[in-house]
Design a protein with these regions (language model features):
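Metal-cofactor-dependent catalytic cores
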Residues: 1-280
Length: 280
């Protein structure tokens, strides 16, 4: 099996960046979910509240994070950490320390997205702070992440997407691209749902341990280029019907993972990976 896609999401819930290789760290791929949008109460803001966030594209240069939108000029944000007081921001039930970006970024967001983005600001994860991953599925180990929903890596497979799309078409619906699921790592795999039986995935330089199925939310219904919802409730409705995790409630697609060997290594598109099966 080979890795066919690597995607980094520097800003939570904005567009991702497809890369050919990336450094791999305990907190995720390099720069993944380092930034996040928050409201006036310092609570995280995502496509769940603002689907139009999907219309903001992201680039990384050697010294800047660049945000672009069709209606406004791009804005560049220095990769150097901003000066200023730390804020306490929330992601689900976690409280994290973060550095606020400039007011100019907030003004840019409102100009790009209009009234719904009023009061929204951009913050950067403070690397002096550690956000622990829930320990329920870590088998006694430890892991941490930045502003991801819960885990530093999300792994999906081409075989599972093919199976989902076959089911969508059979139900009279339109197939969806992989970006609906916002994975970090996509593995080429002929058979559907094989990832649900993997314990680890590794190459010579790193090992990822698959911890739990990823329960999906309504962001999967949002077109990741236009910010619109083409077909109400899909692909969630079809995923629920497929019931790929009969022992769990909800719709699931992909596996959450943590790094268990190879901190600081490099992961590459095209490299062959091996898997070990989960114990029955």
């Amino acid at each position: 099996m080979k890795i066919t896609q690597l995607t980094v999401y520097p800003v939570k819930s904005l567009q991702g960046i497809d890369v050919s290789q990336s450094e791999i760290h305990a907190h995720g791929l390099a720069w993944d979910r380092r930034w996040m949008l928050v409201d006036a109460q310092q609570r995280f803001v995502t496509q769940r509240q603002l689907p139009a966030l999907a219309t903001i594209s992201v680039a990384l240069t050697s010294d800047a994070l660049v945000l672009s939108h069709p209606t406004v000029e791009p804005i560049s944000i220095s990769l150097e950490e901003p000066k200023g007081n730390l804020r306490l921001v929330s992601v689900w039930s976690d409280h994290c320390k973060a550095l606020p970006e400039s007011e100019a970024v907030s003004e840019w967001l409102e100009a790009a997205l209009g009234e719904p983005a009023k009061g929204v600001s951009l913050v950067r994860f403070a690397t002096t702070f550690t956000r622990a991953v829930e320990d329920d599925f870590l088998a006694g180990g430890e892991a941490h992440t930045y502003f991801a929903d819960g885990y530093p890596f999300l792994i999906t497979t081409t075989g599972s997407l093919d199976a989902l799309n076959n089911a969508l078409v059979a139900g009279g619906n339109t197939p969806v691209p992989m970006n609906r699921f916002r994975p970090n790592i996509v593995v080429d795999c002929d058979e559907a749902w094989q990832e649900d039986g993997w314990a680890t995935i590794e190459s010579g330089s790193y090992q990822l341990t698959l911890r739990k199925p990823c329960q999906r939310c309504k962001i999967t219904t949002v077109d990741q280029q236009t910010g619109t919802i083409p077909t109400q409730a899909e692909p969630l409705k079809t995923l629920l019907a497929l019931n790929t995790q009969p022992h769990l409630k909800g719709a699931h697609f992909g596996q959450n993972a943590t790094l268990t060997a190879g901190e600081g290594g490099v992961i590459r598109v095209g490299e062959v990976v091996s898997v070990t099966p989960r114990e029955a």
